[in-house]
Amino acid sequence: AFYHRLWWPDLVLIKRDAFRFHLPTKHHLIERLSAGELPQWFPYDALGRPFIGGTHTGVFHPFTALYVLLPVPDAYRASTLISCLLGALGAFALGRMLNLSRAGALLAGIAFALAGHAVSMTDNIVYLYSLCALPLFCLGIEKTLRNRIAWAALPAVVWATVFLIGDVQTGYYYTFIALAWCWARAPGPWLNTGLRLMLIGCLAALLAGIQLGPAWAVFASSDRTQPALFHEQALHWSTHPLRVATVLASPVGEYKDLPDIGRFFFGNPQRPWSVWAESLYLGVPVAGLAFLGAWQRRDLRVLALLGTLALVLALGRYGGLYDVFYQVMPLWSAFRYPEKLMGVVSFALAMLAGAGLDSLRTGWFRPAAWIAAATVCACAWLGLHTDTAGVWAAAEFGAPAPLARSVTESAAWAFLFSAVAALGVGLAVFGARHERLRGAWPVAIIVAIATLDL
């Protein structure tokens, strides 16, 4: 229901790259294809640049068929909607594969598709699709490890489509996700697991070769081959530590002047967009259930590992580890925007939240923890709601007084909403301790609270 407007005809996505970049390039693509030729050159950007080799044009991705059949704005909306549905259904299917209950898998799908990071990516189909394909990719790897080797085609095709739509960076990250998944969940000998993973990688490379070849030619002639020159640009849009708090409490001035908020509070001085993802929100209910899931389901610790590692890397210049990878890992220095890795954090937390919900269903009741979280959030609301908080923020961050007051006020309301959500979950958990209230109702209430909170 959240994405219902994507179903409406004659609407155009106009936010950021959707309108300024993707719609014009798709128009050019369809014009060239209609003329019976592949668009080798894009003359409308500076003095011109390669079109296919630019990767993010997504010439060979299956979504291109939508642009042939529909008007460009409608095709873009349809591809955005399909990506969101793919993410939700993929997370649900992966949850069932990981032995989550239907309710747990449902919560995982909802939390992943409605997470702030995923919603923020609706302005860029390249980044949105590669994020939403991640659950299906992990599902394919799990099936390949546990069933016939023919299942290797599924993760290979998903992986290839990530390259074909143009997100080579996330496709590169998929390599590390696949390695971690196989290391943690391989049921058989390491040799057999390694061969299956190599098969997946080779198939993906063959399928995506038509895009990776031109992309490599463009990359080889760019300044991205020189890490020392590209270092500052690569670390731009690192996730500021203050932004991590918005995973639990949001919005924090998100609907005010985003460039000024990014400039004064999150260390990004460049305009017009000083934050990469407009929201990183998941909420206290999802985060709390994710912690419980990681604690109770030891077989899913790979998700906790992936989420933690991705979070530290997403900090970029503030975390230090990204710089190490930049210097050590092959090709890592070719990519930018560390905050992209927050999508992996959202994925891991969403899946673990489903496992945490199942822990409540099996009798692991700790309502006091939820009441304590609600109390902490309520105290934060009381503290940030004062004029003193606005004065302190203006002095500490050098922000104009009206902006500082606006941010602290919105943060206060965000913590109040989080307190209410945490209290609601705590009451549902408390009720589930009693025989008369056990069953589907407490679980349904918790899922509803988490959904409404998102």
Model-derived features with residue positions:
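Active-site lumenal/periplasmic loops and adjacent helix-entry segments of GT-C-fold
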Residues: 4-98, 103-133, 242-277
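Periplasmic/ER-lumenal interhelical loops and adjacent helix-loop junctions
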Residues: 16, 20-33, 37, 201-293, ...
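Hydrophobic, membrane-inserted alpha-helices
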Residues: 61-64, 88, 112-116, 135-136, ...
